[in-house]
Regions:
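Short, cationic motifs built from Arg/Lys/His that form the positively charged side of catalytic pockets
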Residues: 512-515
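Short alpha-helix capping/helix-loop boundary micro-motifs
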Residues: 517-522
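Conserved, single-site charged/polar hotspot
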Residues: 2-510, 524-541, 551-555, 561-564
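Short, exposed beta-strand-loop hairpins at the edges of beta-sheets
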Residues: 546-550
């Protein structure tokens, strides 16, 4: 779960750690649906009680198409086009009994239970879901933590996710959170996630507080056995309840992600782990060899064995398990520089020796390669060299925890931590609830020491049901304009063709004739009630290809009456 860091840091600087709770209404969260925001069209299935602009109400199972066209939104429904301007709101109402009450988007199965606010941004449809906090969590908790997790772990996740959402409420913006890992993953409601729904229901409104403000309830998939400080991840000031501490539960969980590699102590071929790591290690050895008078050429020395191997130098102070290096103590086979002892010569002649012609550079001479008696120590950077060479990186972040253990004939290297490591570990919470029989309150107390739990009012009644009188009242008709005389159809039907009349619209309304058999296709003409047309072809999709006396196009079959 990544965070909007600039905003967090700015608020911390401005107000200190204890941020004031500024929102008075905790019942609604506004979610920018980024999964659907890069489209000029959004398909909406109505599976509940919804209305638009106090004009339209929809039967359960209705399909709408809302399209951005020339800076405006147009809603297509039952062959009708409604020009909504720059915004359209699908407003949810109370529905009878326990029937589902929400929307399905772009043909998906999950339910989006809220008011859908649609506007135009850069020519695209921008969807923002205004959803009750507890309903919002039904689309978050089972996607941040699997529905199969123990119920107390799911409850802890529900409290953390609720607290995160409430802390981010910001009436000055047009949305509070996005639906991806920049905030929290939100995917809508799947009725099969019964455990997550139970966890949300049994912790309704429970939120984490510290010094009178909503706490920073960060959470991570796995911390690798040690919680991380947000200062080490994002900078800023320390947070009293988010510190570095050992987490035995995360590391005990067999489902915590671990990547491993084996490095032989006495490689027969001089390879340390693999060829890539060997090249890195040998390159780091070259300066030492040259200083001690050994041939530094890579081809002339080899690694006989690894005497010791361990992680070294904490990256964030002595308590941190995130290390900078893997320190290796190595036995080498190398060539020592050859030295020659020359005795001085005395000439019996008094005449000076002739001047020697200048010679080129003298190439060093080397003894035969032999084992070096003194071990060499080299520090190999974990990030990126070791994790890349051994292919043990988990999430491409330079915050993973590397451990080295002695396995007899080899050293075993393991890498752990999936995510930023701050706050609640989902794998740790799973282990605590599953193997240690703890409550969600105890889980939260372990990961957020000093945080208090408080129950907030996070529910509001839905708008009253749409009245039966409103359901029976047709929407407003367009302002009457002089109706043109219908153009008579002079052409007679041929083989496989029929005469039809436009009957499925109001007497003073029109039916759109489209260029293609699609609700978003261009409108090429408007047909009036009672107008006679020639049906040329019946399509499987429910469309008809028709012809007037002047043009051909497509209409939905249910709006015409075919005369055979």
């Amino acid at each position: 779960m990544c965070k909007r860091l600039a905003l967090v840091i700015a608020l911390i600087i401005a107000f200190g750690i204890a941020l004031p709770v500024i929102a008075a209404d905790y019942a609604t969260v506004r979610v920018l649906l980024t999964d659907f925001a890069a489209s000029r069209r959004i398909d909406v299935g109505v599976y509940g009680s919804y209305s638009v602009d106090s004009i339209f109400t929809f039967q359960r199972g209705s399909d709408l198409v809302i399209s951005s066209e020339q800076g405006s939104l147009i809603m297509y429904y039952e062959g009708m086009a409604y020009h909504a301007g720059d915004e359209i709101i699908l407003r949810r109402h109370e529905t009878a009994g326990s029937r589902e009450n929400g929307l399905r988007l772009q043909g998906g199965l999950n339910l989006f239970e809220g008011d859908l606010h649609l506007s135009v941004q850069d020519g695209f449809v921008r969807p923002v879901l205004h959803i009750m906090t507890e309903d919002y969590l039904k689309g978050v908790v089972p996607y941040e933590m699997n529905d199969s997790f123990p119920i107390e772990a799911l409850k802890a996740q529900a409290v953390a996710a609720r607290t995160y959402a409430l802390r981010n409420l910001d009436p000055s913006q047009f949305y509070d959170v996005v639906d991806n890992t920049n905030d929290q993953v939100y995917r809508g409601y799947d009725v099969s996630n019964v455990n997550a729904v139970r966890a949300i229901r049994e912790t309704a409104g429970v939120s984490g507080m510290y010094a009178g403000a909503f706490a920073l309830c960060y959470y991570t998939a796995s911390n690798g056995g040690q919680t991380e400080s947000p200062v080490n991840v994002w900078g800023g000031e320390p947070v009293p309840y988010l510190t570095i501490k050992e987490d035995p539960y995360d590391i005990e969980n067999p489902e915590s992600i671990v990547k491993r590699a084996s490095v032989a102590k006495n490689p027969s071929d001089g390879v340390v782990g693999n060829s890539e790591l060997t090249q890195v290690v040998k390159a780091l050895l070259q300066p030492q060899l040259e200083t001690l008078g050994y041939n530094p050429d890579l081809a002339t020395f080899s690694i006989l064995g690894i005497m010791d191997m361990q992680s070294a130098e904490p990256l964030y102070g002595d308590s941190s398990r995130v290390m900078r290096f893997v320190r290796m103590s190595l036995r080498l086979m190398a060539q020592k520089r050859h030295t020659v002892s020359v005795d001085p010569e005395v000439s019996i002649f008094s005449a000076a020796a002739p001047t020697q012609a200048p010679q080129g550079p003298v190439m060093p001479r080397w003894d035969a390669a032999r084992e070096v008696t003194v071990p060499f120590t080299v520090d190999v950077p974990i990030f990126p060299d070791v994790e890349s060479a051994l292919q043990i990186s988990i999430n491409q972040k330079q915050n993973e925890i590397l451990r080295v253990s002695d396995a007899g004939e080899s050293f075993e290297v393991s890498m752990q931590r999936y995510g930023h490591g701050v706050g609640l570990s989902q794998r740790g919470a799973q282990q605590m609830a599953q193997k240690n029989d703890v409550t969600y309150q105890q889980i939260l107390a372990f990961y957020y020491p000093g945080m208090e739990l408080k129950t907030m009012e996070t529910s509001l009644p839905l708008p009253t049901p749409v009245s039966s009188a409103f359901l029976a009242t047709p929407g407003p008709v367009p302002t009457a304009t002089p109706r043109p005389t219908l153009m008579p159809l002079t052409e007679k039907p041929g083989e496989g063709e029929w005469i039809a009349h436009v009957t499925g619209v109001a007497a003073n309304s029109t039916l759109n004739l489209r260029a293609l058999p699609d609700m978003t296709s261009d409108i090429i003409m408007q047909l009036y009630f009672g107008q006679e047309v020639l049906v040329l072809e019946r399509l499987d999709s429910g469309w008809l290809r028709i012809k007037t006396d002047v043009i051909q196009g497509y209409v939905m079959e249910r709006y015409v009456n075919i005369v055979k």
